[in-house]
Amino acid sequence: MASSSDSEDDSFMAVDQEETVLEGTMEQDEEPHPVLEAEETRHNRSMSELPEEVLEYILSFLSPYQEHKTAALVCKQWYRLIKGVAHQCYHGFVKAVQEGNIQWESRTYPYPGTPITQRFSHSACYYDANQSMYVFGGCTQSSCNAAFNDLWRLDLNSKEWIRPLASGSYPSPKAGATLVVYKDLLVLFGGWTRPSPYPLHQPERFFDEIHTYSPSKNWWNCIVTTHGPPPMAGHSSCVIDDKMIVFGGSLGSRQMSNDVWVLDLEQWAWSKPNISGPSPHPRGGQSQIVIDDATILILGGCGGPNALFKDAWLLHMHSGPWAWQPLKVENEEHGAPELWCHPACRVGQCVVVFSQAPSGRAPLSPSLNSRPSPISATPPALVPETREYRSQSPVRSMDEAPCVNGRWGTLRPRAQRQTPSGSREGSLSPARGDGSPILNGGSLSPGTAAVGGSSLDSPVQAISPSTPSAAEGYDLKIGLSLAPRRGSLPDQKDLRLGSVDLNWDLKPASSSNPMDGMDNRTVGGSMRHPPEQTNGVHTPPHVASALAGAVSPGALRRSLEAIKAMSSKGPSASAALSPPLGSSPGSPGSQSLSSGETVPIPRPGPAQGDGHSLPPIARRLGRHPPQSLNVGKPLYQSMNCKPMQMYVLDIKDTKEKGRVKWKVFNSSSVVGPPETSLHTVVQGRGELIIFGGLMDKKQNVKYYPKTNALYFVRAKR
């Protein structure tokens, strides 16, 4: 019934609408209304009636590749506007690079197309005829560094990877080659490859082959030449008119070259020009930039293990003898730190390099955080911790132990010590040696740690009052207790660590030096200077030079598990670990160890750091299950991530004044994703494309691909 009534209502409404339309039509026939004509005219307007400024703004959102080409076919007006939009896109990008006003875009899996294999030291170039970036060869990050000879095409309109199955004579698998564009051909030259694992001790193989690839025919061709350069890799090349100029490179057996070779791309013949004057040092891995038809810029390079160059040279290709000209580099301290493994690309009157960002300057983009270098001559001062939990802070504090290769702390071999029975045992703390961290990131302050005794709020307590004295030559087993922390959660327990094997070898007390008037931080009148501090850890003065080992996270975790098991049995177990303190009548503020021997107890002092004697990793392992080293934080916010930053070199005064200048940016937009080396940088239409590279193994980044990363750098809107 309900359905029938609804259908009837619908039929009535339809009839009413038809009658209304008919009446309106009759009224229009009888007496037309100018308002309806105006409304009909307004609905029939097209985009051609829009102001050109508005239409040009709308067209600026199109992709500068295929969408521009398609829009230009609509009409003459759109063709003219698209030309203006393309001009503004290019010059707007050049201005954005000069001012550092850029934005980053990353392409991570999954995205359309077959994912390309991770690689570095590959070759890449931009081919404008089909608006694509071609990638050839490279190495993979494996034990054997296997090389590839595959060719990939990135469609920049759809951002899709396509592997063309070409015919002809394929090149050998190699890396470190150069790929340049000449007319409708891609020219591949040089390269190297690792030897096979068997037989052993084979040298690397270098190539002097020339291959051309035709994208229109999908065909590889091998070019045979004579009297050419030796086999090389890591060289640089560029095309000017119908010549390919090749400079430098590695020749194998730790030999570098600074020769210049010219390949006639019409006759496929090699020649070596005469060059007068001083020349750059032999190098490889440099960048080669075309200034004009008669000038080439050489930037950076590597001449060997201890020869990393940051210089700049001009090669003048006159009609007579060619000549080298060294350039003055201004603001070198603001330049790219490593030019030999980070290629450069020209954008307008600037050269862009993407290299490692300075420590502590800016975080990763968009949400990765950088960390300063863990190597420091003077450890930073420890400050009291705020009430916020560490897991809620996006940036770790400086007093935390560094994460090296995905592990916390520093693992060192255990020293062997002689026991009274003659057997050798491993100890977490070896015998006397140079000062070194005992607990990475922990804090044992003079007011909270002492030998053989403890104050009321000290985290160091003796295991037993009947411990043998230092004069008898025995080691003292110091039990460390985890004191309650200010601002901690209510369910946090007072954990006392009494099973950590820290052996502090004490010298016998001298009977000639009295105890009266001595500082409370000394034992037997030795070591009058203040306590030493090693890597942010305060230790007793005579102990700082005697500790050379480090407590591993595994030992701390096992100790904490044992403490939890003992604390769960009741307060009696924890009370056995920390007996009540007593004072010897012979020396106030000290505890008796044996007859006639006293060890002073330090007075209560202000807590160093957050008042704990264990490093932060131990405290986190005590509060959280050891599932991840980044407890309570996203895995992509690793403290070992080194961000990549855009560096811009101004080359407008290169020929007139003989200088280049690194630009200084205060904007954080120039800092991008994690740093990669041996990647490629290619300029497209109003953007830069960064692909691949070798990421440091210490960078524990989960949300970014390691060596098949694809980034786009564009002007910020």
From Swiss-Prot:
Keywords: Kelch repeat, Phosphoprotein, Repeat, Ubl conjugation pathway. The modification Phosphoserine is found at residues 365, 373, 552. Residues 416-426, 455-469 have a biased composition (Polar residues). The modification Phosphothreonine is found at residue 378. Residues 31-43 have a biased composition (Basic and acidic residues). Residues 363-376, 570-596 have a biased composition (Low complexity). It holds the Pfam family Kelch_KLHDC2_KLHL20_DRC7. Residues 1-30 have a biased composition (Acidic residues). SUPFAM superfamilies: F-box domain, Kelch motif. Kelch repeats lie at residues 132-184, 186-242, 244-293, 295-342. Coiled coil: none annotated. Substrate-recognition component of some SCF (SKP1-CUL1-F-box protein)-type E3 ubiquitin ligase complex. Specifically recognizes p53/TP53, promoting its ubiquitination and degradation. Component of some SCF complex, composed of CUL1, SKP1, RBX1 and FBXO42. Interacts (via the kelch domain) with p53/TP53; interaction is direct. PANTHER family: F-BOX ONLY PROTEIN 42. This is F-box only protein 42. The lineage of its organism: Eukaryota, Metazoa, Chordata, Craniata, Vertebrata.
